[in-house]
Amino acid sequence: MDPVPLFNPCEMGRFTFSHRIVLAPLTRARSYGNLPQSHAILYYSQRATKGGLLISEATGVSSDAPCTNTPGIWTKEQVEAWKPVVDAVHAKGGIFFCQIWHVGRASDLEQEPISSTDKPVEKNEDMDFPVPRRLAVEEIPDVINHFRIAARNAIDAGFDGVEVHGAHGFLLEQFMKDGVNDRADEYGGSLQNRCRFALEVIDAVSTEVGPDRVGFRISPYISYYGCHDSDPDALGVYMARELDRRGVLYCSAVEPEMVAATTVVDGETTTTTMSRRMMIPHRLHGMREAFRRGMFMVGGGYDRDAGNMAVASGYADMVVFGRLFLANPDLPRRFQLDAPLNKYDRATFYTHDPVVGYTDYPFLDDDREAMSDHTG
């Protein structure tokens, strides 16, 4: 069998990775009352492999930070609830990072949310978002401290490190992107000012747990929750350079969305949706060049072939898989064997059932021995 680039081992800092297939941080809406539940023990342990990296679902840093039914890590009870989940991953030899976040104006809680602005997310068919309160400059250190404490709590829960969530339209990105940030103080205006908050969070978290335990997720080209930027190339490269300078373990970047290509032939218009790698090859290349000291991860619509190509070409050190890993708990094995994949069921992504669409996806051999020790 030909070598599979995704299975080239690598070392970075204190960690040795047996393969380069990373579980994406996936919100699953099954942490009732913002508390990790026993069924998460099975879910994460199913996807753990020796020397494989897993990133937890986004985990709130304070009582106003999460969405409904997503976990937190600001209380002792939450820390204790995470411990058996982390232990189950470690029992399989996995490496486990906790993604920490604050949703900002994308909140679904009843309390008034905070943001870089006082403009709400535009109403959509699923949700009418509340009007946020513009975070005062003097309040920002408190939020930074919440991230710092959450990082310490994650390490106390046994996690190997933390990933700061700076992507997908949540609080830190609401500051970074000029499509949302309309401030006129030291946290708004210039690119450097808009990125100040996120970098101060990185500095505080790195000081608390060490930069070699810290990663950052960024999505310059994605406009979730109305969060867009006029120059995503500049934003991505600037943040990658600053993260590299700080010596964090990794930068995890999300590829641009698929785009519709329109062609006109003999007066007839044809619209075709093409892969982002066909339309904009190596769009993250500038970020990759700017971030060289640590691991550069890419994610967003990758499959086995594209992942192997990304690693083999040096475009990425590791590849983050979301929906494929969700539906295939043994995804590394399937990729190694080039075996068929389960199809994911989108309708169960965010339901609250502790089994259906969560821990009931079959293994390649339907071998549930890996599950039997962690039935909760």
From Swiss-Prot:
Binding-site residues for FMN, renumbered to this chain: 25-27, 58, 99, 217, 301, 322-323
Residues that, per the record, bind substrate: 165-168
Pfam families in alphabetical order: Oxidored_FMN (PF00724)
SUPFAM superfamilies in UniProt: FMN-linked oxidoreductases (SSF51395)
Cofactors (names): FMN
Gene Ontology molecular-function annotations: FMN binding; oxidoreductase activity
UniProt record, GO biological process: fatty acid biosynthetic process; oxylipin biosynthetic process
Enzyme Commission code: 1.3.1.-
Keywords tagged on the record: Fatty acid biosynthesis, Fatty acid metabolism, Flavoprotein, FMN, Lipid biosynthesis, Lipid metabolism, NADP, Oxidoreductase, Oxylipin biosynthesis
Domain of life: Eukaryota
Alphabetized CDD domains for the sequence: OYE_like_FMN
Gene3D superfamilies linked: Aldolase class I
InterPro entries referenced in this protein's UniProt entry, alphabetically: Aldolase_TIM (IPR013785), OxRdtase_FMN_N (IPR001155), Oye-like (IPR045247)
Record family assignment: Belongs to the NADH:flavin oxidoreductase/NADH oxidase family.
The protein's role, per its UniProt record: Putative oxophytodienoate reductase that may be involved in the biosynthesis or metabolism of oxylipin signaling molecules.
Name assigned to this protein: Putative 12-oxophytodienoate reductase 13
Organism classification: Eukaryota, Viridiplantae, Streptophyta, Embryophyta, Tracheophyta
